[in-house]
């Protein structure tokens, strides 16, 4: 009977171990599902970051196109200033020529005045020529004055243009420097973005592969969990049947013990109910000694049968 109880306790212990194993499977499946959700979230964040980087690259390209357009406009404006500068230089040259002509007229006038002692005709002619020269001189002076004003204005405009050209040249140099820096930065940013995009794409591929692997492993663990739960359910069912059989066997053992005890009591009594004072005591004692081993052997056999039956049932259960 003690052996039966030990085997029953061992069966309950194995059932507890099966429950622990099921708990470990459930925990591992839960960890796999959490990891799967984490990988899905990281994949979504990487896609959003890739879209944001692509938008930044497009904005950089728009800025570069706008800067190229501004450089074209500045070059056109510089060409217009160069043409206007050439026209002003031509006006300045004409003013110098007029000043030379006025100087020559003054020399002619002085020469004419020095010949006043000549004849009257010559004087008249000289006066006439002088009047013409004076008139022409006045016209030349007026023209020269106008040219001087024009020259001053032209020089002023030339200085303004030179200043503007200097400013534009400085701005052009700055813009070219900025353009070079921008192009260099754009190349660096573009290369960096490309490298980052390639790394992100590789990371996305790795995460997708790991996600597929985890999904397959999750399916495998779920299938294993289902098989374990089915086996556990079958074990619980068999255990209940075994408990019922054990209770029945224990009842039978208890009834057998009661029967053995009753038989022992009956065996210890005289066979005819009367003690023989002479040979009867010896005969009754022999009969009692003969019946007692038979009853004991029957009790031991019943207990052995019960233990063997329980052992076979328990072995089938395992």
From Swiss-Prot:
Keywords annotated in UniProt: Coiled coil, Membrane, Mitochondrion, Mitochondrion outer membrane, Peroxisome, Peroxisome biogenesis, Transmembrane, Transmembrane helix
Function: Involved in morphogenesis and proliferation of peroxisomes and mitochondria, independently from the previously defined pathway controlled by the FIS1-DRP3 complex.
Topology feature Mitochondrial intermembrane, residues: 313-318
Any one Gene Ontology molecular-function term assigned to this protein's record: protein homodimerization activity
GO cellular component: a single term: cytosol
Subunit structure: Homodimer. Interacts with PMD2.
Cytoplasmic side: 1-291
Name of protein: Peroxisomal and mitochondrial division factor 1
Residue ranges the record marks as coiled coil: 19-260
Disruption phenotype: Enlarged peroxisomes and elongated mitochondria.
Membrane-crossing residue ranges in chain numbering: 292-312
Keyword Nucleotidyltransferase applies: no
């Amino acid at each position: 009977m003690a052996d039966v109880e030990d085997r029953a306790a061992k069966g309950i212990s194995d059932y507890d171990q099966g429950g622990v194993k099921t708990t470990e499977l459930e925990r591992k499946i839960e960890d796999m599902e959490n990891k799967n959700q984490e990988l899905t979230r990281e994949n979504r964040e990487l896609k959003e970051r890739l879209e944001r980087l692509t938008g930044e690259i497009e904005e950089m390209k728009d800025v570069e196109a706008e800067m190229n357009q501004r450089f074209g406009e500045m070059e056109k404006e510089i060409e217009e200033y160069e043409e206007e500068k050439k026209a002003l230089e031509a006006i300045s040259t004409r003013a110098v020529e007029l000043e030379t002509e006025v100087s020559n007229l003054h020399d002619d006038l002085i020469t004419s005045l020095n010949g006043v002692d000549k004849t009257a005709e010559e004087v008249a002619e000289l006066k006439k020529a002088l009047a013409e020269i004076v008139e022409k001189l006045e016209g030349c002076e007026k023209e020269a004055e106008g040219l001087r004003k024009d020259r001053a204005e032209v020089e002023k405009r030339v200085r303004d243009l030179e200043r503007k050209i200097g400013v534009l040249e400085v701005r052009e140099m700055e813009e070219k420097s900025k353009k070079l820096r921008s192009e260099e930065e754009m190349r660096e940013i573009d290369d960096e973005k490309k490298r980052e995009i390639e790394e992100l794409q590789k990371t996305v591929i790795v995460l997708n592969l790991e996600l597929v692997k985890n999904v397959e492993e999750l399916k495998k663990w779920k299938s294993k969990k289902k098989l374990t739960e089915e086996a556990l359910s079958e074990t619980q069912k068999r255990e209940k049947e075994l408990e019922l059989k054990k209770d029945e066997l224990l009842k039978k053992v208890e009834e057998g013990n009661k029967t053995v005890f009753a038989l022992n009591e009956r065996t210890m009594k005289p066979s005819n109910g009367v003690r023989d004072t002479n040979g009867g005591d010896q005969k009754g004692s022999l009969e009692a000694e003969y019946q007692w081993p038979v009853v004991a052997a029957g009790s031991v056999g019943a207990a052995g049968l019960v233990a063997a039956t329980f052992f076979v049932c328990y072995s089938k259960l395992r």
